[in-house]
Each structure stands twice: as C-alpha cells, then as structure tokens.
Amino acid sequence: CKILNNEKYKEFNNIYSFYKAINHFGDSFVIDSDVVIFKNIFIGRPKTSLYFLITRPKSNKEEWIPIIKKDKIDNIIVSNDYLPSLLGISYWSKSDAEKIKEHIHKFMAKNILLDNSLYWDNIPMQILSDLNVGYKELSIHDAYEIDSIEEYHFALTLNHKN
C-alpha cells in the first residue's frame, strides 16, 4: 500500500488522481475513497480485469450500470434503473492497464480535468471493446459506496448488521 499526494485534489477531478498513481496501475485494485468495505473481498487474485458491482436500494439516483454480454462488461450507462451498478472497486490486469495507460494523455487537457462530471472510469469506458473486463457482484453487506449523508447513515446500519 502506498499513499500518494495529489496537490490538485480540490481543483481537478479524479482523472488527475488516477494520473498521479499511473505508475502503480496494473495487476492492481483501484478503490474509490468513498467506499466502505465491511468484509474482506480481496480473497484470491482475479484472473481478468473486473468491476465489483452492488445492487443499491431503489432510488431515483443515477448510477453507472454495466451492460453485460457473455459474462463481460460490454458498455456502461448512467441510469436510475434498479440493476447492479459499479461499486467503486475494480481490478485491472497488466495487459488491460497498459491499454488504459495508452489513452490517459487524451484526458489530461485542463478543460477535461476541471469537468466534475468526468471520472477516471471514463478512460476504460471509451475502450471497453479492447479490454477484457468481467464483473463480480457483491452484497451491500460486503461493501457500500457513500455519496451523501443519507448513504453514510445507511452504511452505518449495514455495518451494525454484519
């Protein structure tokens, strides 16, 4: 584990944070800082790149929903459909990481880094057809992503049930 300093975390979106960690990317997990993990989900090394998914409680909030074809993530859409969505944890093989690294320069323009609607996941999303990305669905009792005070309180209730 290595902690990296992002001196521009207040100014730029997390694409810049990803850029700061690019030398550590590959055969590695990426865990967004707003994810709470209740159980050890890191048992065994995945054979392919994958996104961890959860099914959140029904709401009108839009989430990143993977479109799955033949056990692989074919596309990712933003929707409030009640379906499994990206959790904020992923694993990337060395070969897929190298392909993503080849595209990061396209995302380093200041106007892109200042766009709060973009995330580092936008990079692999653009080249999913060139990647081998599977998925692993978890229970909300395994991990949860916190984006609001309401979700924080919900996560506390989940933790007390574990």
Where are these regions (language model features)?
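Solvent-exposed, flexible loop/coil residues
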Residues: 13, 19, 41, 80, ...
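Conserved alpha/beta core of the MobA/IspD/sugar-nucleotide pyrophosphorylase nucleotidyltransferase superfamily
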Residues: 85-162
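Short, motif-level signal for alpha-helix interfacial/capping segments enriched in acidic residues
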Residues: 10-12, 71-72, 126-128
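Residues that form or immediately flank small-molecule/cofactor binding pockets and catalytic motifs
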Residues: 8, 81, 140
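Conserved beta-loop-beta/alpha segment of the NTase-like Rossmann-fold superfamily
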Residues: 1-64
